[in-house]
Amino acid sequence: MIQVEKTKMVDAMRSVLPGVDKGSAGIDGANLFLFKDNRLFTYNGVTSVSVPFAMEGAKFGINATNLFAFVNKLNDLSVNIDFVQDKDDPTKMKSVKVFSGKTKATFALADTSEIEKYLEGIKFTDGKPCPDNFNDAFALAVIKNNIHPEMKGVVTTKIGDKTFIAASDKRRISVHELNGDMDEFKVDDDVLADALKLGKPKTYAIVGPWLHLGYEGDVTFSCIRQDMSKFNAPAMLAAMDKLYAIEPVVEGKLPKSLSDAIGRVSALAGTTNTNTGLTVQLTFSKEGITAYTEKNDGNAEELIPWDSDVKFSTEDSVQSWVSINILLEAGSKVTDFKVVMSNPAKKSYAFLFTGEKYKALVGGISVKEG
């Protein structure tokens, strides 16, 4: 019989729940707690979360939802665990009894062969320090609602002696400088968002195809890295630097009421093409930004006055169609912006957002397509 503290067991199970929350019907064992090698594992087909948990070397799998719900409701401070042997084969376990005080439950053991096969490649090693602004940098750099599967995700990339985290959806490049060195990798942004729910990672390690993020209490979040070959981050950053060097035609801070106004006129927003989704035409003038949308036989517009000083270096009309989702997402993160003429021949403009260590490029759509 094994006796463990209830609090420690509940904390351990709770810390690995991100590995079962999204389960995977295609993998047997995606809904399990796997106890193996004195660690507790979960794996949902995409990510694995594990934490040290002494179980005298025993290996077994139990339905995660049921075990967590039962142990979490126990009143006593300790939990007892006993293994029931198979009568026909004493070398095998048939079930596990979990009891505390006068409350007891028996859990059938699950087949863990498939989940163990996927976890064979996981090898733990001493991690390198993770930059202290990694979570904040990801929150700013990530691009939500990315409609291009091959671009979806975030990458870390090195330019000179600096490391950046970057994302792109072909119409926008979003970049944030990290406060420290980090090896290069690409991971799915939804997966990384789950990892950061565990808190701020202290260490990271790349072992084979896996990225490991280490947290307090020796909790480890593991996920499979993605192919970086279609994400040329250095070229993207070079393109951004080139645009930032252009003299802006408009420069200032976005009006605080821009988001609400865009929300109102978006009711009549149409789709420009498959790369953009819903679009809005922005016209920059000294009075403010005029947001205009059209769909079928209707249209809507609203003038959003400036609420701070804005610099203009041209008397020409500065006007372009922009993806609504991209504009709102970038504008919700930083309010400082520049507008530069990216292609004088076509009179197309690029919108540049700038924070202390954050930059984002939002490409304009110079010709409205049907």
Predicted regions and their residues:
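Structural preference for solvent-exposed beta-strand-turn elements
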Residues: 1-370
